[in-house]
């Protein structure tokens, strides 16, 4: 049986690599860790994973990215991966964004 997948999404390559490295060091025995560098790339990856009937357990996304915010990505990902948990990361102290994410897209 294939390992469930954790998808990380961040347009900053150094941040993306660091998050992926940290997740792999802790969870590689139980999860397959993959990454995308944009919301559009993440949605393409999620669609392909769904076509292959692979389980996405967690999506970890940066909030501020060009083209699509993390909130938009997590909202658009819901129909494709309804069972996945979702985490929104931001380096900014933006309380309004956090409240919107929790209320509008049901972040845990």
Language-model-derived ranges and their functions:
Residues 3, 29-30, 54-58, 80-85:
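His-Asp phosphorelay/catalytic-motif detector in bacterial-type signaling
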Residues 7-8, 60-62:
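Active-site T/S-Asp motif of two-component receiver
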Residues 12-18:
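Short acidic/polar segment at the start of the alpha1 helix of CheY-like receiver
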Residues 20, 26, 35-58:
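Acidic, metal-coordinating helix/loop segments flanking the phosphotransfer/catalytic sites
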Residues 47-54, 76-83, 104-105:
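Conserved phosphotransfer cores of two-component systems
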Residues 65:
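Receiver (REC) domain active-site loop signature in two-component systems and cognate sites
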Residues 68-72, 79, 93-108:
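Alpha4 helix (beta4-alpha4-beta5 surface) of REC/receiver domains from two-component response regulators
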């Amino acid at each position: 049986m294939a390992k469930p997948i954790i998808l990380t999404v961040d347009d900053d390559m150094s941040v993306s690599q660091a998050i992926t490295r940290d997740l792999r060091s802790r969870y590689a025995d139980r999860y397959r860790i993959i990454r995308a560098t944009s919301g559009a790339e993440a949605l393409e990856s999620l669609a392909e994973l769904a076509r292959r009937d692979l389980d996405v357990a967690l999506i970890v996304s940066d909030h501020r990215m060009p083209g699509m915010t993390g909130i938009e990505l997590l909202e658009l990902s819901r129909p494709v991966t309804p069972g996945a948990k979702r985490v929104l990361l931001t380096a900014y102290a933006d309380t309004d964004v956090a409240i919107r994410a929790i209320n509008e897209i049901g972040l845990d």
